[in-house]
Amino acid sequence: MKNHVQTHNKSLDEINNTVSINTHGKFSQKLFSFLGPGLLVAVGYMDPGNWITSMQGGAQFGYILLFVILLSSLSAMLLQSMTIRLGISTGMDLAQATKHYLNKPVAFVFWIIAELAIIATDIAEVIGSAIALDLLFGIPLLVGALITVFDVFLLLFIMRFGFRKIEAIVGTLIFTVLVIFVFEVFIASPHVTEVLNGFVPSSTIITDNGALFIALGIIGATIMPHNLYLHSSIVQSRMYDRNSIQSKAHAIKYATMDSNIQLSIAFIVNCLLLVLGAALFFGVNTEQLGGFYDLYNALQNQPLLGASLGAIMSTLFAIALLASGQNSTITGTMAGQIVMEGFINLKIPNWLRRLITRLIAILPIIICLIVFNSNEAKMEQLLVFSQVFLSLALPFSLIPLQLSTNDKRLMGQFKNKLWVNIISWCLIIILSILNIYLIIQTFQEL
């Protein structure tokens, strides 16, 4: 590796070093000034991809996959804290650090995989938004998918009001989703003992190929590659002293608190989704268990709710789904910009970047809709496959993150502690082994 020299461009230059922080007030005031980037990252942990994998996990295997959500969320907290340290201590995002650390041909391969991961993320957002538009307004899935092309202009409009406003809008939408699902799980009345037992490890997760497939989907939907790139960049939006070790340490401390708080909320939402799927569907013999349409119809026809309340709750569910898809669009756009600028130093207009990504993402969806005659179950299956691809792509983000954050020449006193190295390498190795096992099993069953 080359010696680190601060010659790289600023990450996301338009928001870099633009948000003031409180360094002399009370603890709560200091923390509040850092709250925000974690919200944008948490969005990726509760996007439509999480919805379908968590709901299908609950519907097909009851509560046993709650342990996977817990493990994934704790792992995510550690990994996001590593991206925070990388961004604040070096002034580089993960894409820039990867390019800096690897030789050009290898970095190019990693860039392609990062771009494909962002497209896979976008597929989930398009499908979720298209289904929400169908549920709310009866818009055909094909038309709904095409309509999502125009949300490319959403971020451009919101960005005019400043980065802090984006954080506030995203936070409001996340809170809305949380409240909706807390109430819906309350109505579904799951058995508390069974839910708590779901957090205990079960061998079924490994021995049952179906459970392993959904478990990897949950991991892929929870620990998302684009979030690692995103977080390492947007933490640099705060106006800490770039030349002060003490100021950087202060920023890392509060940015990590922000991250852990928001990821805890995302953890709760994902658990609620799985519990909802299990409470309504586990043991029910249907062709497609725990899909968006199934859950929407179940809420609408839930005897406990009655006709009027059922209609309200199913509509709220669809609104939350649409909000989730749009939230993820905001962060996906930023991540795409970070990856393209960081790896190949190519700056193109945001609207064009977004349009290219969205058009590529829509292509497999349109093919799926045409070939399977707008079959809803096939759309939801495509979404699950997109999440499994994210799980396969994850090591290509994790390995550069691990190598970069453990390099003293790059990180100085902020390099990884021994326990961080042990856990992060274990995560990378275990995930890689599970991925290889899954691929072998999948091909054997073809």
Swiss-Prot record:
Is Membrane one of the keywords?
yes
Annotated InterPro entries = NRAMP_fam
Q: Name one GO biological process term.
A: iron ion transmembrane transport
Q: Which GO terms describe its cellular component?
A: plasma membrane
Membrane spanning residue stretches: 32-52, 59-79, 107-127, 139-159, 168-188, 210-230, 264-284, 303-323, 355-375, 381-401, 420-440
A family per Pfam? Nramp
Where does it mainly reside? membrane
- GO MF, one annotated term: symporter activity
Query: What keywords would UniProt list here?
Result: Cell membrane, Ion transport, Membrane, Symport, Transmembrane, Transmembrane helix, Transport
Q: How does it sit in the membrane?
A: Multi-pass membrane protein
Compartments it resides in: Cell membrane
Q: Which family does the record assign?
A: Belongs to the NRAMP family.
| PANTHER family linked to this entry | NATURAL RESISTANCE-ASSOCIATED MACROPHAGE PROTEIN 2, SOLUTE CARRIER PROTEIN FAMILY 11 MEMBER
Q: What does this protein do?
A: H(+)-stimulated, divalent metal cation uptake system.
| The protein's name | Divalent metal cation transporter MntH
- Per the UniProt record, the source organism is Staphylococcus saprophyticus subsp. saprophyticus (strain ATCC 15305 / DSM 20229 / NCIMB 8711 / NCTC 7292 / S-41)
Q: Top-down, what is the taxonomic lineage of the species of origin?
A: Bacteria, Bacillati, Bacillota, Bacilli, Bacillales
Q: Which gene encodes it?
A: mntH
